[in-house]
């Protein structure tokens, strides 16, 4: 079990060589050794994962309300239990997502799968916009201020409020270290 403190990030290499970067406030459950014919972990939070390929042992990432099956790929998962929306952004390879409504959805590189309740949408994104936290920065490109403040609030575990009279969008980089 890995629990990442607020204001911190962590990196772990699993017994099969799979590498995981975990963001602040993330809980990651994984075995010391993978048994049987599958490799399975559970995440409540945000990770970037680079899965070591093994066609004979699929890799499964479970969250509170979706499952992700891969053979060898790299992708981001944002699935904090408290958030209404969960997302997956695929960097390389292919993954199959078991959505909460029972459907299985295959996504490709540069696809983002977003799920709220029993609804989901898949759209194209720039993957570079999603993983800056693992390198100690938060990068934003035309992002609503409310989204930026939500990420900062989660990272540092503090409540941030502002007057939302009109939407404000921002671009830039924030150093987390």
What do these predicted regions represent?
Residues 1-177:
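A residue-level detector for the "anchor" residue at the start of short, highly conserved motifs
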């Amino acid at each position: 079990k890995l629990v990442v403190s607020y204001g911190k990030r962590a990196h772990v290499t699993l017994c099969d060589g799979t590498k995981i970067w975990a963001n602040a406030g993330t809980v990651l459950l994984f075995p010391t050794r993978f048994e049987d014919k599958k490799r399975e972990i559970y995440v409540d939070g945000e990770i970037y994962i680079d899965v070591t390929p093994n066609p004979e042992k699929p890799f499964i990432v479970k969250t509170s309300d979706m499952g992700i099956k891969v053979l060898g790929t790299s992708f981001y998962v944002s699935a904090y239990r408290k958030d209404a929306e969960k997302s997956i952004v695929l960097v390389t390879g292919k993954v199959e997502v078991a959505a909460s409504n029972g459907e299985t959805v295959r996504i490709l590189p540069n696809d983002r799968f977003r799920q709220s309740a029993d609804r989901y949408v898949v759209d194209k994104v720039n993957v570079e916009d999603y993983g800056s936290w693992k390198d100690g920065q938060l990068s934003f490109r035309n992002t609503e201020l409310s989204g930026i403040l939500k990420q900062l609030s989660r990272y540092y575990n503090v409540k941030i409020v502002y007057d939302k009279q009109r939407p404000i969008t921002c671009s830039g980089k924030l150093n987390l270290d």
